[in-house]
Design a protein with these regions (language model features):
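Metal- or metallocofactor-binding catalytic centers and their adjacent structured scaffolds
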Residues: 6, 38-114
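Structured beta-strand/loop patches that form or line metal/cofactor-binding pockets in enzymes
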Residues: 1-44, 50-54
């Protein structure tokens, strides 16, 4: 079992080696949100999701707001299984699929590390 102690959210923008042109959209950088989840035993898990209003409908700012909301629902929770992670995140907020995936991947990464899988 793991207990969530801390969740940090990082907003990054990485320049692309080549510009992507899609319809009326030109993409020159990759905007992503990185999520680090730390347990009470100081182990960490990481997750990431890209933000793109033109592809996913989610902006970095919106993802950060959603993650701050989800974060408050998860801090100090005890988690034993991937199923619990999924249920906890799905119940926390409607929509916001990219934001949810970033924190879900971080939690699954952390759970796997604590279970040595």
């Amino acid at each position: 079992m793991l207990k969530i102690k801390e969740i940090t959210i990082h907003n990054i923008a990485l320049p692309l080696q080549e510009t992507i042109r899609m319809s009326k959209v030109i993409i020159e950088k990759s905007n992503s949100i990185l999520v680090k989840v730390k347990s009470t035993d100081d182990m960490s898990g990481w997750g990431e999701a890209a933000s793109s209003l033109s592809m996913t409908g989610e902006s970095s700012a919106g993802m950060i707001l959603a993650l701050e909301y989800i974060k408050n629902e998860i801090i100090n929770k005890e988690i034993e299984s991937v199923g619990e992670i999924y249920e906890l995140i799905q119940r926390s907020i409607y929509g916001n699929y990219a934001a949810k995936s970033a924190i879900e991947v971080a939690l699954v990464d952390l759970l796997a590390k604590t279970q040595k899988k």
